[in-house]
């Protein structure tokens, strides 16, 4: 552990790179790796509850922060998706929760998923949503990721569920960004992009 910056390297992976979102083979390999991990149906004794986290973050930054003029309306829309998610969610298993492309290390013959601090029991489709929103994918590229992950299970119901997760998760990261801003760290650009995604995918979830 580096005492100056807190960085810890437990094992250095030679000749590895993070998932390149411009390389479809990288994206395919990482998404299929994620699906394979979920299919193991691993269980732990703690869960990641998306809406519980939203409430927690709201409590830390103020229920109705004023970063955006229509934030109250947007919040109501995001909260209204909870019932849709509850009625459609798939069987929980151990999920990474933060499977962003930076956390996939790709080698010639192997893939490694790092940074498990948020992991817990959840709907595996939430992991797919998290992958897409961090990369700030447009709908066409998002649908391609969903297609790769779902394979033979691909259906409109699962797509709508992933869109709902994307909307709610984006709102969660808006709150996270606001908390960071209140502590003196500027994530405004990221916060704005996540806010736009939350509004956009709320609409897709209802179509």
Please tell me what each predicted stretch does:
Residues 125-154, 167-185, 197:
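Active-site activation/catalytic loop segments of kinase-like enzymes and analogous catalytic loops
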């Amino acid at each position: 552990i580096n005492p100056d910056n807190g960085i810890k390297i437990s094992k250095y992976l030679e000749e590895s790179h993070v998932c390149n979102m411009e390389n479809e083979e990288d994206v395919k390999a990482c998404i299929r790796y994620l699906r394979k991990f979920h299919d193991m149906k691993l269980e732990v004794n703690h869960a990641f509850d998306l809406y519980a986290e939203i409430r927690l973050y709201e409590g830390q930054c103020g229920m109705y922060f004023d970063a955006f003029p229509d934030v109250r309306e947007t919040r109501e829309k995001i909260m209204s998706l909870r019932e849709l998610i509850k009625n459609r969610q798939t069987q929980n298993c151990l999920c990474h929760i933060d499977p962003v492309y930076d956390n996939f290390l790709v080698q010639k013959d192997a893939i490694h998923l790092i940074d498990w601090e948020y992991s817990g029991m959840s709907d595996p489709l939430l992991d797919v949503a998290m992958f897409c929103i961090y990369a700030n994918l447009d709908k066409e590229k998002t649908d391609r990721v969903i297609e790769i992950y779902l394979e033979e299970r691909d259906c409109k119901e699962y797509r709508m569920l992933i869109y709902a997760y994307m909307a709610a998760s984006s709102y969660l990261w808006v709150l996270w960004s606001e908390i960071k801003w209140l502590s003196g760290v500027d994530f405004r650009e990221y916060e704005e992009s996540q806010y736009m995604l939350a509004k956009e995918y709320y609409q897709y979830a209802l179509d």
